């Protein structure tokens, strides 16, 4: 049985060589067309980068640390303090 499967595999390789080449070439052509359609020019990328930078929040100094951070960032809480708060509320 194994011998017949090996022979069938060899015959399928020789018989489907033309078919597989056609399939692979078609796949490559479709991928190349998609890559060309999806490309974006450098000018468009610069324009998008400029739009994104205008939407960012201003940076303000943190009152505790003095380091600058975005204005919209909420204050962080220590995990140990958060655990203590949650455990006290359950009792």
Curated annotation (Swiss-Prot):
Organism classification: Eukaryota, Viridiplantae, Streptophyta, Embryophyta, Tracheophyta
Protein name (Swiss-Prot/TrEMBL): Late embryogenis abundant protein 2
Induction line: By salinity and drought stresses.
PANTHER family on file: LATE EMBRYOGENIS ABUNDANT PROTEIN 2 (PTHR33509:SF39), LATE EMBRYOGENIS ABUNDANT PROTEIN 2-RELATED (PTHR33509)
Subcellular location: Cytoplasm; Nucleus
Record GO cellular component, one term: nucleus
Protein family (similarity comment): Belongs to the LEA type 3 family.
Keyword list, A-Z: Cytoplasm, Nucleus, Stress response
């Amino acid at each position: 049985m194994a011998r017949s499967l090996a022979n069938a595999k060899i015959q399928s390789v020789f018989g489907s060589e033309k078919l597989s080449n056609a399939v692979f070439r078609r796949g490559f052509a479709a991928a190349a067309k998609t890559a060309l359609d999806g490309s974006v020019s450098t000018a468009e990328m610069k324009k998008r980068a400029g739009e994104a930078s205008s939407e960012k929040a201003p940076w303000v100094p943190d009152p505790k640390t003095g380091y600058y951070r975005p204005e919209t960032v909420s204050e962080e809480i220590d995990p140990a303090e958060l655990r203590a708060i949650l455990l006290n509320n359950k009792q």
